[in-house]
Amino acid sequence: MKYVLIQATDNGILRRAECGGAVTALFKYLLDKKLVDGVLALKRGEDVYDGIPTFITNSNELVETAGSLHCAPTNFGKLIAKYLADKKIAVPAKPCDAMAIRELAKLNQINLDNVYMIGLNCGGTISPITAMKMIELFYEVNPLDVVKEEIDKGKFIIELKNGEHKAVKIEELEEKGFGRRKNCQRCEIMIPRMADLACGNWGAEKGWTFVEICSERGRKLVEDAEKDGYIKIKQPSEKAIQVREKIESIMIKLAKKFQKKHLEEEYPSLEKWKKYWNRCIKCYGCRDNCPLCFCVECSLEKDYIEEKGKIPPNPLIFQGIRLSHISQSCINCGQCEDACPMDIPLAYIFHRMQLKIRDTLGYIPGVDNSLPPLFNIER
């Protein structure tokens, strides 16, 4: 049993959740059976552009986290390592979440035995500011009137307060400089097979979640949750499996196309990079937001490096140190770029460097248990 279709048996979950409610139902099972201390999930805040990481210990509150929030990109890796390392938890994990968690585990920051990862297939996320501008421009509505959004069949779909639905092809949005975040456009890992389960709507029947079982723990979770009546399962058709594989293949080809565009054809010149680095105000947002930056004592704050009062900082020192520390483990989550108030395209250089390491040494961060290259050198 590698692939299954799953549907929640709880009507409340079915009404609120996406495509069958499998993820929420499995979290409810884990909490009710006290297999975890809590679930770290994203809860909607003021609107669809505001996602709040929330640690839930009462299964009745899980339904508040059901549904998608594509316009509130975040990463759970650092939150787990910093605040929940001693807890047994479950987490909904996009590929970059799962990669960060697994990479941090290699660096002894997270104990994977304490983390159930329910993976979420991901075709990309949209920054909240971009989303609001995009909705106003292309959908011709007030962004604050949007009550729900989803990505389906290559379209970004919104639902308004009056129940009206509007959709635009993502390809059209991205041709105009909107749509998914640039790092998401380049990402070729859409199915989080490094998690215990990988869940999504690709190939799924209406009202069901298509689930790929990726670990023995994931298999046992599905079997036990079905036995105790939390979910219903059935086998997907061969055609459904093929549809899912085809969608993944198309998305990977598109990602490679964007990699070539961003990291080769449009990659900034040295002169352009100098202009970017001169914008830096040394706010440390890139470091603080990076899920793989975890040192208690940061090299960037050493007296002999910090150059107190100097803005912009020397890029060979400031960003050079970050590159040497992070590039081998960069998961292309884009959090550094999102945090930068000066719009420096940081993910370009980090992702480009990681791809060179991948192509040279064969190392892909966060997909398996192999150590990063600098930790795995033979004398």
Curated annotation (Swiss-Prot):
Lineage: Archaea, Methanobacteriati, Methanobacteriota, Methanomada group, Methanococci
Top-rank EC class of the record's enzyme: oxidoreductase
Cofactor(s) the protein needs: [4Fe-4S] cluster; FAD; Zn(2+)
Keywords of the record: 4Fe-4S, Electron transport, FAD, Flavoprotein, Iron, Iron-sulfur, Metal-binding, Oxidoreductase, Repeat, Transport, Zinc
Gene designation per UniProt: fdhB
Subunit organization: Dimer of an alpha (FdhA) and a beta (FdhB) subunit.
Keyword Iron: yes
Free-text remark on how the cofactor is bound: Binds 2 [4Fe-4S] clusters.
UniProt binding sites for [4Fe-4S] cluster 2: 290, 330, 333, 336
Gene3D superfamilies: Alpha-helical ferredoxin (1.10.1060.10)
Function: Catalyzes the oxidation of formate to carbon dioxide, with coenzyme F420 as the electron acceptor.
Name of the protein in its database record: F420-dependent formate dehydrogenase subunit beta
Keyword Electron transport among record annotations: yes
Similarity-based family: Belongs to the FrhB family.
Pfam families: Fer4 (PF00037), FrhB_FdhB_C (PF04432), FrhB_FdhB_N (PF04422)
